[in-house]
């Protein structure tokens, strides 16, 4: 099969948000499969330009997330999924690159859902994506989404609020504008209106539009990606959303065979994401 269009996924997500759509409490027992998916070098170049990553013979570490996003969303927007895609929150993302993927490669894609579980704030599910070149898996990803609802764990106490840390000057400052996020949405194929439409963002509880989590996950790598080994693991945990426009400070600590990254609100010090990069 070929990947569905972003518009088709968006329409299915909107239809799936209607309360008349029945939902099961089980994950779909199917795998979305795409054979011989070509990579568009022009799209890779546009992705690199908007995120600040390098454009060369190999795709950036996070690019396959954008490449395979239509396949992931075709699974999540199915009416056999246990909850609606609209309003789901991206909480974590774990990428393992076993070997670089060339911009000239055609790849195979496999996406499945697993590990549906309860959380204090709702239901968590993992979307597992494998990207293959030939017969070998080159890139593996586990994307975790949260659907907010009451569960048996809803009465658990919230973690105590963290005190504002005393921070040194950041290693870099990211200035993120609504225009940049609209460009990322066009390039990355994630047209969720909470990122591009202030009215839609308010309907989902945000005071204004927010940056895509995977935009920030890509942008924080710009200063260190030239030093990555070919085989690498990148784990990201998302915290408070980036309200646009935003100025965020990037803090980088090197050691233990890799890097620890934190993107923080410059005024209040709270984290937008924490991440680790480690060689395999």
Curated annotation (Swiss-Prot):
UniProtKB keywords: Fatty acid metabolism, Lipid metabolism, Lyase
EC number(s) on file: 4.2.1.-, 4.2.1.55, 4.2.1.119
Entry GO CC: fatty acid synthase complex; plasma membrane
Enzyme class per UniProt: lyase
Gene3D superfamilies hit by this protein: Hotdog Thioesterase
Ranges of residues in domain MaoC-like: 162-256
Record field: transmembrane: none
Top-level taxon in the UniProt lineage: Bacteria
InterPro entries: Fatty_acid_synthase, HotDog_dom_sf, MaoC-like_dom
Reaction catalyzed: a (3R)-3-hydroxyacyl-CoA = a (2E)-enoyl-CoA + H2O; (2E)-octenoyl-CoA + H2O = (3R)-hydroxyoctanoyl-CoA; (3R)-3-hydroxydodecanoyl-CoA = (2E)-dodecenoyl-CoA + H2O; (3R)-hydroxyhexadecanoyl-CoA = (2E)-hexadecenoyl-CoA + H2O
Heme as UniProt keyword: no
Family listed: Belongs to the enoyl-CoA hydratase/isomerase family.
Designated name of the protein: 3-hydroxyacyl-thioester dehydratase X
Native organism: Mycobacterium tuberculosis (strain ATCC 25618 / H37Rv)
């Amino acid at each position: 099969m070929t990947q569905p269009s972003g518009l088709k996924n968006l329409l299915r997500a909107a239809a799936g948000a209607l309360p008349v759509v029945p939902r099961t409490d089980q994950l779909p027992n199917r795998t979305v499969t795409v054979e011989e998916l070509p990579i568009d070098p022009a799209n890779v170049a546009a992705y690199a330009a908007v995120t600040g990553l390098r454009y060369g013979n190999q795709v950036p570490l996070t690019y396959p997330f954008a490449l395979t996003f239509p396949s992931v969303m075709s699974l999540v927007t199915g009416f056999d999924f246990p909850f609606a895609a609209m309003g789901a929150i991206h909480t974590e993302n774990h990428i393992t690159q076993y070997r670089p993927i060339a911009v000239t490669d055609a790849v195979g894609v496999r996406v499945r859902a697993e590990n549906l579980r309860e959380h204090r704030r709702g239901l968590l599910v993992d979307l597992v994506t494998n990207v293959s070149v030939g017969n070998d898996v080159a890139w593996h990803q586990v994307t975790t989404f949260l659907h907010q609802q009451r569960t048996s764990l809803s009465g658990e106490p919230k973690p105590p609020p963290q005190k504002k840390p005393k921070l040194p000057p950041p290693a870099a400052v990211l200035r993120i504008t609504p225009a940049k996020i609209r460009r990322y949405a066009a390039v990355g194929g994630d047209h969720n209106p909470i990122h591009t439409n202030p009215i839609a963002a308010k309907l989902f509880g945000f005071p204004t539009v927010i940056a895509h989590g995977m935009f920030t996950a890509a942008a924080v790598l710009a200063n260190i990606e030239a030093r990555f080994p070919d085989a690498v693991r990148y784990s990201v945990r998302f915290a408070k959303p980036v309200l646009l426009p935003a100025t965020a400070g990037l803090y980088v600590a090197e050691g233990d065979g890799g890097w620890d990254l934190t993107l923080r609100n410059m005024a209040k010090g709270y984290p937008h994401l924490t991440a680790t990069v480690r060689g395999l």
